[in-house]
Amino acid sequence: MTKILKYLKPYWLSIVLAFGLLFGQATCELTMPDYMQNIVNTGIQNAGIESGVYQQIREKTLNSYLMFANDSEKDLITSSYKLVTPSKATKEEKTEIPALKTENVYLLKDINEEKEEKLSSTLTLLQMTMVEVSKEAKEQNAQIPQLLMMNGVDAYRKGAKSEISKLGDSTVSSMSSQFLKKEYTDLGMNMEKMQQDYIIFSGLKMLGYALGSAVCAILVGFLASRIAAGFSKDLREEVFEKVTHFSNENLNTFSTSSLITRTTNDIQQLQMTIVMFLRIVMYAPIIGVGAILHVIESGANMTWILALCVVVILSVVLLIFMIVMPKFKIMQKMIDKMNSVVRELLDGMLVIRAFNNEKLEEKKFDQANSDITSISLFTTRAMAIMMPIMMFLMNGTTLMILWFGSKQVDSGMIQVGSIMAFMQYAMQVIMAFLMITMVTIMLPRANVSALRIHEVLSSEITIKDPSNPMNFSSSMRGVVSFKNVSFKYPGADEEVLSDISFETKPGETTAFIGSTGSGKSTLINLVPRFYDVTSGSILVDGVDIRNVKQADLRSRIGYVPQKGMLLSGDIESNLLYSKKDASKDDISNALSISQSTEFVSKKPEGIHSEINQGGTNVSGGQRQRLSIARAVVRKPEIYIFDDSFSALDFKTDAKLREALAKSCKETKSTVLLVAQRISSILHADQIIVLDEGKMVGKGTHAQLMKSCEVYQQIASSQLTKEELANV
């Protein structure tokens, strides 16, 4: 998988940008529970009072606190407030604080955060001291100053500190808020408006963060799609380019259906995984770690619940991953098998129908289909177990948080809003793992797909251009020499060709004939370097073909395969395939030589007539003639015909060979011709007779009829004595 991911390198900037956006999205998501907590704790429970420090306080209330304060506390309080009298108060101040119209009020100065915290704790202590004194005064029906003179302030301050330590921070904060709320009410302030303003302002902030999160998510989705699509495009191009450079040996390693699957299905699998990785896998750890940090900062003693849940989730994911990974590997191979069966069925449909074997092929397909269905059911069921388990864990975690959290709320350790925020963070942690779990469904298949693609990309090309290529001699043209050539297919024990030696001359035709399996097609496929010789050498124009570039070698060859192969497009595009800059005269001449002019001219659109993939909309003979015309357009030095006249009738065959021979004489082109019919090679300048990979005869027809027994047998099996005598 990691070897394939190197193709993401051109998109590193977009990936970094996506990561930054994910971080922004996570920040927005993690901020919203804090605002929800503040809305519940401060906005609802504390009536919008944010701080434990009085922003405004009446003079008599402040003086009552100073009764319980020591000298340093008095200095802190008096230095933090300024006295405003009704005569000096502004109109705005009187509107906001109606009590300023009739009595003196202290307003909080602009103090730093450290001093504000110290002031808050001091006021809380004084408030609790006042509660202690007031409680005893009520019990003894005495005045507060009287009690202070009798018992002293320190005794009550000590009791207040003890009470604060017993109560949780939540309870103390709530009690402090009640003092502030009462004071603000006595000041005539609109507490309902204060509460509404706080809730609305906090709610708008939440909406802003939600909008920011949505924008980040949309941008990440856009970037992820572009990165994955670009990655897939580059990878497909790389695979396609690699396959186009495969030798026949490499192509035999992978089936056609497998290469198609690897280029389409496997790369598509990786594309989907990259999108999910950028949108989920990268996001999940950010949101998960961030939520855990917020949980730890919250001070709630329930982190162990999350730790337990995470351990269980990881265990389940790893277990299922280990079970399904091998099955996904098998599944991809079965998809290859299915494609192979379908391809064979479609290619051989005429033969299947001719022998009434539709039922047999249906059984083959049903078997392949059943195998895929069986393993798909297994993997799908295994993965389907994940989601219910995760939902169960999520609900169980929620119940545990509520159970243990309610006890902490009851003891005053935390507030209700804090429990709600904790639940939100816990859900974010669990959802992060849930998202990763969803991706793990794709990761095993993606890993298998990556390995299969890497197999193609890492395959060593067996036929390569030399590091220091030579150039062809300008003094020679169309000379092909075989020198003690032997060849065997990779992995085979026996040689297909053994010690073959001959030489062709420009403008002459060299024909190859022999029984089926004698090595005729193999021999001529060595000339364009579709395979490399096992031993010996092949020279073209005096240069070993292994010492020149393949492109240079093949540019001198006009190759016509045994099975005429046309590409989708039209007749003209197929003919121009061998020489893009061919003129109209070149095309017309090629059609004439290949005896294609007549049937092409009869088509309504002429050479612009459409050709289906594989040339399925023309007859076999027409397909073969157009294949020959394509080679002729190039005007090559060397023609290679691999039994290319077998689909032609005798009359067309004779006309075509006559026209071709005339053209080759004019252009001094060499012809290498594989034939099954003696009649096609009677007038060849040189005939090579092959038998079981060995050259058993070489010469003209007349010479071979005298010297080669194998040739005599072939000739007598195809022609009568009278026909042979008249040759």
Residue ranges and their predicted role:
Residues 10, 248-249, 265-274, 278, ...:
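An intracellular "coupling" helix at the cytosolic face of ABC transporter transmembrane type-1 domains
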Residues 44-51, 58-65, 70, 144, ...:
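Short intracellular "coupling" helices and adjacent cytoplasmic loop segments at the cytosolic face
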Residues 290, 294-311, 315, 321, ...:
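Helix-loop-helix
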Residues 220, 245, 252-281, 288, ...:
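Extended hydrophobic secondary-structure segments
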Residues 28-44, 200, 209-256, 260, ...:
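Juxtamembrane helix-loop junctions of ABC transporter transmembrane domains
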Residues 1-32, 38-206, 212, 216, ...:
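Membrane-integrated ABC transporters
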Residues 15, 51-54, 65-66, 71-73, ...:
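ABC-type nucleotide-binding domain
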Residues 23-31, 207-218, 270-273, 277-289, ...:
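Hydrophobic alpha-helical transmembrane bundles that constitute the permease/transmembrane domains
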